[in-house]
């Protein structure tokens, strides 16, 4: 049979789809999520620093009012039963308590930094209180 010249023809759809090999299917352990992108995660510490800056700018109370009120009433019951509190008194106690705690944590953070750490530990709180003269 003699050779004939091949002429260029237009494609009519290409090849038929082949069946996927079993080994290739077994390699995919988890099914694809249909193009779902995994959620963005900030690096450790980024969100904490953002929260610190946000709280330093604001003046609102950080402890919820009702849990603090329950705590005050529970502590007051040890001294005298059936005590009544004005809402302004509870508010003043909460303001003073939060101011004390914020100051204590600032000093505690300085103690941790002095020890060349960034993590606050109970011993930092104890040192800060001892330096302040609160606990001998």
From Swiss-Prot:
PTM comment text: Acetylation is generally linked to gene activation. Acetylation on Lys-19 (H3K18ac) favors methylation at Arg-18 (H3R17me).
Modified residues (N6-succinyllysine): 15, 57, 80
Record-listed N6-methyllysine modification sites: 5, 10, 19, 24, 28, 37-38, 57, 65, 80
Modified residues (Phosphoserine): 11, 29, 32, 58, 87
Keyword DNA-binding assigned: yes
Modified residues (Citrulline): 3, 27
GO CC field: nucleosome; nucleus
Modified residues (N6,N6,N6-trimethyllysine): 5, 10, 28, 37, 57, 80
Source domain of life: Eukaryota
PROSITE patterns: HISTONE_H3_1 (PS00322), HISTONE_H3_2 (PS00959)
UniProt modified residues of type Allysine: 5
Assembly with partners or alone: The nucleosome is a histone octamer containing two molecules each of H2A, H2B, H3 and H4 assembled in one H3-H4 heterotetramer and two H2A-H2B heterodimers. The octamer wraps approximately 147 bp of DNA.
Family per record: Belongs to the histone H3 family.
Phosphotyrosine: modified positions: 42
Residue(s) carrying ADP-ribosylserine: 11, 29
Modified residue annotations for N6-lactoyllysine: 10, 15, 19, 24, 28, 57, 80
Name of protein: Histone H3.3C
Record-listed N6-acetyllysine modification sites: 5, 10, 15, 19, 24, 28, 37, 57, 80, 116
Residues carrying N6-glutaryllysine: 15, 19, 24, 28, 57, 80, 116
GO MF annotation, one: DNA binding
Keywords: Acetylation, ADP-ribosylation, Chromosome, Citrullination, DNA-binding, Hydroxylation, Methylation, Nucleosome core, Nucleus, Phosphoprotein, Ubl conjugation
Role this protein plays: Core component of nucleosome. Nucleosomes wrap and compact DNA into chromatin, limiting DNA accessibility to the cellular machineries which require DNA as a template. Histones thereby play a central role in transcription regulation, DNA repair, DNA replication and chromosomal stability. DNA accessibility is regulated via a complex set of post-translational modifications of histones, also called histone code, and nucleosome remodeling.
In-chain residues carrying the UniProt-annotated modification N6-(2-hydroxyisobutyryl)lysine: 5, 10, 15, 19, 24, 28, 37, 57, 65, 80
């Amino acid at each position: 049979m003699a050779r004939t010249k091949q002429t260029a023809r237009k494609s009519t759809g290409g090849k038929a789809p082949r069946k996927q090999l079993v080994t290739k299917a077994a390699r995919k352990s988890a099914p694809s999520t249909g193009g779902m992108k995994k959620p963005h995660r900030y690096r450790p510490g980024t969100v904490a620093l953002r929260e610190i800056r946000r709280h330093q700018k604001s003046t609102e109370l950080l402890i919820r009012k009702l849990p603090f009120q329950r705590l005050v009433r529970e502590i007051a019951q040890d001294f005298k039963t059936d005590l009544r509190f004005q809402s302004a008194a509870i508010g003043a106690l909460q303001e003073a308590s939060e101011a004390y705690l914020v100051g204590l944590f600032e000093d505690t953070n300085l103690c941790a930094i002095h020890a060349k750490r960034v993590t606050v530990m109970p011993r930092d709180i104890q040192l800060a209180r001892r330096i302040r003269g609160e606990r001998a």
